[in-house]
Amino acid sequence: SDVTLKDVSIKSDKDAALKVEGDGNVRLELDGKNELKSGANHAGVEKNNSDSKGTLTIKDDTGEKGSLTATGGAQGAGIGGAKNNSGSNIEITGGTITATGGCNNNEAGNGGAAGIGGGFNGSGTDIKITGGSRKPDGTSGCQGAGIGGGYGKGGTNISISGEDTVVNANGGKYGAGIGGGAMGAGENITISDGAHVTANGGAQGAGIGGGSGIGG
């Protein structure tokens, strides 16, 4: 199915601002400036493995300078899994994307989700960012990866390609920039075709690879 967001702002206090479900593929076109912010335990753009088996493609094919700011609630990914859910089969082919995972609600800052990928205790797998993506930014809340796994889980099969692709990935406390959250591994991560990637891990987390306690 095809869905277009055009200058949309959705903020939910209790649920996901946008949720992808079912076995089919979903193509999300970005036109103009769009903002999605979800409630606690939910992802900004929620795509749980348990609910969605197809591929979510986020794109900007119309050339209208589409952008998306997706912010997860506490323990939810910016784009991907809710709390205790994995996020996979996510493809970004265009648009300016800022995805921020949610942190825990306690002062210790434990737990946390990936910017793009898994929620708290959820992995991030089969994530592809290809040419034409202007600037996907993934920033974790607390101990998840910028792109990859949430706290306690890994990030696998992550590919970034294309000379026009610019990616900034910032892991949270103990998470990798790209790969695993705290205590999670990062495996099969590929950067190719001149993609411009900046990946910053948190304390003891790799820029690209595993989170704290795992290594690169």
List each model region and its residues.
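A composition-driven surface/loop motif
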Residues: 1-216
